[in-house]
């Protein structure tokens, strides 16, 4: 999983060049809130994938913090028995994010339009 984190981190820097550690930390807090509100395993895996992707952004600035975060995520996914599904979900969500249009406003990136990942 660490190799996937590193690869996404490199791509993250290209997609979100103005991202900063503070904005990525705030984004992780948002994703963790969404995880708490997840309804069922499917939603939880999707939100954990979002958390992983944000951790890839954090990895750019604080690698040890990101690795600690994904360690917790990985343990949770393994306990649920969804590691293979989780890895596919990360890849699919990241590929989807790369197709979106992004806007940088108030120190954060937000996708524009109404496209949604299902």
Residue ranges and their predicted role:
Residues 1-118:
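Flexible "arm" and connector segments at domain edges
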């Amino acid at each position: 999983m660490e190799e996937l984190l590193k690869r996404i981190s490199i791509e993250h820097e290209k997609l979100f060049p103005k991202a900063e550690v503070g904005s990525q930390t705030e984004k992780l807090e948002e994703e963790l809130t969404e995880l708490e509100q997840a309804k069922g395993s499917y939603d939880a895996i999707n939100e954990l994938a979002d958390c992983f992707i944000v951790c890839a952004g954090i990895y750019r600035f604080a690698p040890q913090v990101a690795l600690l975060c994904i360690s917790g995520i990985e343990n949770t996914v393994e306990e649920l028995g969804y590691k293979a599904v989780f890895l596919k979900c990360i890849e699919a969500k990241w590929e989807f994010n790369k197709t979106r249009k992004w806007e940088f406003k108030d120190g954060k990136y937000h996708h524009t339009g109404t496209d949604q990942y299902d």
